[in-house]
Amino acid sequence: METNFEDSKSLDEPVLHDIAIALLKNDYWSLYLSPEQKRKYISILNDTLLWNRFINVIEWDKLCDEKDSNGSNDDEEDDLDITTLFRCRCMIFDAKINPALFDLSSTSSGSIEHVDHQNISLEASLAEEEERKKGDAKKSEATGRQLFDDDDFDESDAEDSSKATITLDLQKDKSLRKSIIDLKSVDIDDMDTSGFAAIESNKALSNISFNYVYYTLENDSENINEVKKFEDEEDTSTPNTSSFQNNSSSLDLSDNLSLNSKFGSLTSSFKYLLQYLEGNRSKINATDADVKQLLSDVKKNKSKWANDQRIGQEELYEAAEKVVLELRSYTEHSLAFLTKVSKRDAPDYYTVIKEPMDLGTILRNLKNLHYNSKKEFVHDLMLIWSNCFLYNSHPDHPLRVHAQFMKDKSLELINLIPDIVIQSRKDYDDSLIEAELESDEESTAETSKHVTSKKTSSRGGQTQQAVEVHTDANSPEENNTPVTKKEVETSKPPAVSGSTPPVNEAAVIESSNTLEKEPLSDVATEYWKIKTKDIRESHILNNRRILKSLQFIETELPMIRKPTAMSAFIDREVAYGSIDCLPMDKGDFEPIMKLDTTPLLEYDVGSGVPMTAGSVLETESEEDLYFRDYSLFEINRNTPGVPSLMYKNIAKMQEIRKLCNKIQTVRQLQLPQPFYYEHHKSHVPFANNEPILLDIPQNYDNMSSFKPLAHDVLKKLCTIILFHAGFESFQMGALDALTEIAADYMAKMGAVMDQYLIYGKDKSQQEIVGQTLGELGVDDVNDLISYVYHDVERQSVKLLEIHQRLQRHFVELLRPALSERNDEEAIFNQNGESFVTGNFSYETGDDFFGLRELGLDRELGLDSLSVPLHLLQSRLRSNMSWQPEATIKGDQEYAPPPKYPPITAESISNEIGLIQGFLKKNLEEFGLDELLEDEDIRPRSKPPRPRLPPNGKITTGRKRIASSVFLNQSLRKKRCLKENEQGTEVTTLPEE
């Protein structure tokens, strides 16, 4: 098609056409277009009608269809598409709206000649030049944010073109405005078609625009495997960066191939491990190389079949032995095949069967290293079943059923044996050398065969030479060259005998075609993929963590937007709008907003959706700071509310326990038995000053679950409740059980309240809380108030009263109880205790009480022994305790009642007649003038313990001899003998 812009009047936007040419000449096209899209862009610039329809957006869909059906097109690569038209138009309008982003001053030298348009006069051009200079001066002082509006891309207004400032210098000489440069003379292949080379060399690298379109997220599938690897490494804390790089080229365990077919040489030893891996293939994120490495690590170093001189023997024989032992273990069917057939059982067996075989013989052949390949082993194994079928030819013979079962089982187990031919060390080394030489020769011949050719670009006709596999990646025609199977086989390295599996030729051909046929995407998309890779991976990680615990609701009422609920979205929008497109210093082209922090709107699917009810605290900004200060949530005795009261009650309980221990200690001193202090140790005081510190990690925003942290806090709160209930100590198992019960109760409460918040939006917060507590067993909120009042607040008053009573009782115990009763304790004053306890004998070296002779000093580990004073005091105390209560003086609130009159002989007549006889009898029996009351009678004292003699030996009373039986027998014998002497009959003694 002829191109003539000389007389063209159809160009509505001549300035845009000049900008388009300047972008092409200054290599700014590489920021938006790929090399293929560049060729289409040139065809649009060279065609007047095409340019007019392109710039005015006139039936683009029909335009693409016409280009596809036009037979005059020599190349399919020049077929227009909507994506190319959109990116070309976007590039032109970006340069028009923000000329500061593009340095097009080089076009003023005359490399691009301006078009002489009849509707633009020289005076208008000069006026526009002056306006352009003024606009440039203003734009150099201000910086703004690059805005992308759909209206800017679709409207071409004459008023906008008059106001737009263009850096192109208008040529004052009309003679220079003849025609546009012939773009056919531009050699496209000589230009930088890589796209990124121009980007790296250009100062406008940081100003590549890629946020003006929405990108689909299918490219994230490339990062899924890397994200899974990262999650596994995050759990195990063992990073493996090399697996990220090789993950795209490795096969996943989710393939349809079974593990037994992939690792046949290793599966015989790890049957159960592979069964587990096979059953959990969807949960295990590991490549085939990882599984093979795992099996190699678990496998023991060397087996009994290892032999360095016979390559492949260890793997072959180990697998074969496993198969034989597995077959022998099926005793239900294998009993007839374990040993040779006896001639006694089958006399004609060896006549019919010329080559007998059994499992025992195969096992002996393995021990004798009889087999050199899998084929030989399988032959002997199948010979067992064929011999059985041959000898037992009757179809209903029972052994045929067993043989068929064993044959099927052996065919299943044979797949686990690697196809290996055992070689000697010398033959194996020779084969490696030959294979290496052959691979070098074939690679040299293949390299000389593949020659690339350069394609010439022309509009009239293009010639193209046949190209082999290795071609330039920039040429789409060359990329479509198929790869033959012969070439793949030629480039394949020679196989070495062993367990190495053969190369899948179809997979190689398919992967080669896929790589070569994959077209290059546009520069902006590639730039977006590279620069947003890290942030996209972080988005995927966060989304996967959230989805683990997220529950979707099928039916949901519409959300009501409120200022507090939309605050997060508004703050983010304001923060994004405050970022300038260019830095303050125009000479420095480093952007303020880095690409790592670029917001991806594709992932922000809920940017305009308010948060759910209950998730936003409707408070003022000053109060928001309160909830961000984690130190305010430390729970200790100074915390206001119920926890502080509980801490105070617990502290008061500890003081009461200490006081009880002191009282118990004083009472133990009054007892005669020994007292051991370690049996009554005081309780460890409760750490009431230790706060609950929330150990919030630094990366708490990326934590998948706060369950461990919440569990620890709840356990501490349960501990406080148990101490407040009166428990002195408890087992950790009981505490964990109580914590789990409380956690389950709180989780149910949250779930019920969440349902009410979602479906009960017409109810108030008080009603929601009341109904939630009612479903969980709390009938009324007043029950909670009663618990706080009676069990927490009033308990502090009760504990204070108990502490005061115990304090008074302890003071009374410490007073000298016998100071006003008797002065006999004066004998123990002035160091008189040493004469009583025996301490004076320690200085003289005598053992006064014989305690050292008894070995008590060695037994108790004491240097000096003495009788405890409380033994003597207890006896004295018992002697003095008979005194009536009347002698004890004390302050009493009320006077005691008067005593009853004593009963005498004269007063008996005043009593009732029923007891007069009893009273007279007691008076006569005791010979008393009056009867004593029971409380006036001195208590009967127990007999005193025997004292130790001076020698220190403890003696016991003589034991009584039960001689009555023997005495009676001797007396009866004497009587019988006496009667015998007197002539009476002798009788035998009766046996008892």
From Swiss-Prot:
Q: Where is the composition biased (Acidic residues)?
A: 149-159
Q: Which UniProt keywords apply?
A: Bromodomain, Nucleus, Phosphoprotein, Transcription, Transcription regulation
Q: Pfam families, per this entry? A: Bromo_TP, Bromodomain
Q: What biological processes does GO assign it?
A: positive regulation of DNA-templated transcription; regulation of transcription by RNA polymerase II; transcription initiation-coupled chromatin remodeling
Q: Phosphoserine: which positions carry it?
A: S475
Q: Name one GO molecular function term.
A: structural molecule activity
Is Phosphoprotein included in the keywords of this UniProt record? Answer: yes
Question: InterPro entries from the xrefs?
Answer: Bromodomain (IPR001487), Bromodomain-like_sf (IPR036427), Bromodomain_CS (IPR018359), BTP (IPR006565), Histone-fold (IPR009072), Spt7 (IPR037782)
Subcellular location, record wording:
Nucleus
Query: In its UniProt entry, what is this protein called?
Result: SAGA complex subunit Spt7
Q: Which organism is it from?
A: Schizosaccharomyces pombe (strain 972 / ATCC 24843) (Fission yeast)
Gene name of the encoded protein: spt7
